[in-house]
């Protein structure tokens, strides 16, 4: 990891942890913290800060608000996802609406991806 990026992004990550959205809090406290693996919130994977990261299986979990559906943001997300995949990460993206309306399915999907990565 590039230390200059990390030094700049760490304060941002700390701030984002304190200002989680309602959907991030719900997913974190009611699902991700209960998983049998360590999940990091607002993890620096330079040059980005990802919403959630499971290091044991290199799984990135991103929650997208409505701004992510604007062309500029969707292009940035595609570039970000490509970079993370080059680093060997799998990226799961869910909308805030997914968390609000399909919460159980989102949690099951995340759990299944973790289980799949633990399988030989």
Q: Which residues fall in each region the model found?
A:
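Nucleic-acid endo/exonuclease domains
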Residues: 1-120
């Amino acid at each position: 990891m590039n230390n200059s990026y990390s030094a700049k992004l760490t304060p941002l990550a700390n701030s984002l942890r304190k200002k989680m959205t309602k959907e991030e809090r719900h997913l974190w406290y009611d699902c991700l913290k209960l998983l049998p693996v360590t999940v990091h919130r607002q993890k620096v994977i330079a040059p980005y800060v990802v919403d959630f990261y499971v290091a044991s299986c290199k799984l990135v979990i991103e929650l997208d608000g409505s701004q992510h559906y604007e062309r500029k943001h969707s292009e940035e997300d595609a570039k970000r996802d490509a970079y993370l995949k080059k680093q060997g990460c799998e990226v799961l993206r869910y909308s805030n609406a997914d968390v609000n309306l399909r919460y159980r399915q989102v949690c099951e999907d995340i759990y299944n991806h973790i289980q799949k990565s633990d399988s030989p």
